[in-house]
Amino acid sequence: MKRTRIEDDFNPVYPYDTSSTPSIPYVAPPFVSSDGLQENPPGVLALKYTDPITTNAKHELTLKLGSNITLQNGLLSATVPTVSPPLTNSNNSLGLATSAPIAVSANSLTLATAAPLTVSNNQLSINTGRGLVITNNAVAVNPTGALGFNNTGALQLNAAGGMRVDGANLILHVAYPFEAINQLTLRLENGLEVTNGGKLNVKLGSGLQFDNNGRITISNRIQTRGVTSLTTIWSISPTPNCSIYETQDANLFLCLTKNGAHVLGTITIKGLKGALREMNDNALSVKLPFDNQGNLLNCALESSTWRYQETNAVASNALTFMPNSTVYPRNKTADPGNMLIQISPNITFSVVYNEINSGYAFTFKWSAEPGKPFHPPTAVFCYITEQ
């Protein structure tokens, strides 16, 4: 067998025939992977690497090191840098110092909130109640009515007629006869007064009264040639007008006739139904109270039946018919002013004057026979008047 003749310029390093392949695409044999390798410069096999891998001055592979990273004995290590608050360095561990309302929860930095602050949809917000709104990304007062803002943006109270703001006080702006010091009052002159019920009232003297329409008229006590005529108030009624044990269970007739400083009284009562038709008690009393002007107050007698005899008008301001408060002191449990004893049957009657703390009153008392209808005989009494 004839040996193949080897050319004198044969190169045993791959690629073998460089002269026939002047453009060498890759210097590694086809059975070697090109991963991690490259031809740089052409015809030279070299490693392919990127940062942080590099070579040193001795053409040895090494790493690029940043700040706080060192290579000691072939090992990489990190050096925790010097920190400033709120960062901390403890045992080569970097941390974050927090104080309320900032905290760390579930490895996350959180913000602790309390009402009215809240966190909604990962956003810090504020809850507003009545009187507050959020306008133009700011919390604002929501005024209404007389409240408003002045030129400096301060909340103020708008005052209209009759009121004004003086310094830090809201005061009444009044004119006479009104007066406002600690409270609103009314200056009164002669002829006017304020009643216990807080009403402005005209003070009436002798000979004057109010009619049913509230107008001032001459009273029923008329002076004729220097002699005072007799006047009468009574409770005459064809229908039941008195409620003792139940509604309208009796008919009460009371007649007061004035003559000078005295009043002659006549009274009779008749039970019409219920317990008054068959008495269980051995006594019965009826109290008629009046205010300081002689007006009948709420009691057993229907006030609509208490009228002047002469005009048939409802009696009002009958001060001239009231028991004298000096002769008959108020709320005294003294002996009754009059007493009448009937012999057949034996019925006792008495009347007590001004058994009341204020104003005037008549308290009529009768004895009764249990088991029988209550209908005592007519009684007569006399007393001295207030005027």
From Swiss-Prot:
Localization, UniProt: Virion; Host nucleus
Keyword match Transmembrane: no
Database matches in Gene3D superfamilies: 6.20.10.20, Adenovirus pIV-related, attachment domain, reovirus attachment protein sigma1, domain 1
Pfam family, one: Adeno_shaft
Keywords tagged on the record: Capsid protein, Host nucleus, Host-virus interaction, Late protein, Viral attachment to host adhesion receptor, Viral attachment to host cell, Virion, Virus entry into host cell
Ubl conjugation keyword on record: no
Chief location category: virion
InterPro entries documented for this protein: Adeno_fibre (IPR000931), Adeno_fibre_knob (IPR000978), Adenobir_fibre_prot_rpt/shaft (IPR000939), Adenovirus_pIV-like_att (IPR008982), Attachment_protein_shaft_sf (IPR009013)
GO cellular component: a single term: host cell nucleus
Domain of life from the UniProt record: Viruses
Induction comment: Expressed in the late phase of the viral replicative cycle.
An annotated GO BP: cell adhesion
Membership in a protein family: Belongs to the adenoviridae fiber family.
Note: All late proteins expressed from the major late promoter are produced by alternative splicing and alternative polyadenylation of the same gene giving rise to non-overlapping ORFs. A leader sequence is present in the N-terminus of all these mRNAs and is recognized by the viral shutoff protein to provide expression although conventional translation via ribosome scanning from the cap has been shut off in the host cell.
Function: Forms spikes that protrude from each vertex of the icosahedral capsid. Interacts with host receptor CXCAR to provide virion initial attachment to target cell. Fiber proteins are shed during virus entry, when virus is still at the cell surface.
Domain notes: The tail region anchors the fiber to penton base capsomers, whereas the shaft, built from several repeated motifs, allows the knob to protrude from the virion.
Assembly and oligomerization: Homotrimer. Interacts with host receptor CXCAR. Interacts (via N-terminal tail region) with pentons.
Protein name: Fiber protein 2
